């Protein structure tokens, strides 16, 4: 996985988790939903990079 892509994926995942927690604690469903979406985006980016790495190894 490219280091910059991995860092971006980890950053998106972390920001999403924080938004979910803050949104849940504050009762802000919009922020909680945005956090879930951002975390999912980070998960997808990480999965994409792992797939690219797996293809390169073959």
Swiss-Prot record:
Residues 1-58 are annotated as: Disordered. Pfam families: CsbD. Residues 31-58 have a biased composition (Basic and acidic residues). InterPro entries: CsbD (IPR008462), YjbJ_sf (IPR036629). Belongs to the UPF0337 (CsbD) family. This is UPF0337 protein SAV_738. It comes from Streptomyces avermitilis (strain ATCC 31267 / DSM 46492 / JCM 5070 / NBRC 14893 / NCIMB 12804 / NRRL 8165 / MA-4680).
């Amino acid at each position: 996985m490219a280091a910059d892509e991995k860092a971006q994926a980890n950053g998106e995942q972390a920001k999403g988790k924080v938004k979910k927690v803050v949104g849940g604690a504050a009762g802000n469903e919009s922020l909680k939903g945005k956090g879930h979406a951002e975390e999912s985006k980070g998960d997808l980016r990480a999965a994409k990079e792992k797939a690219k790495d797996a293809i390169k190894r073959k």
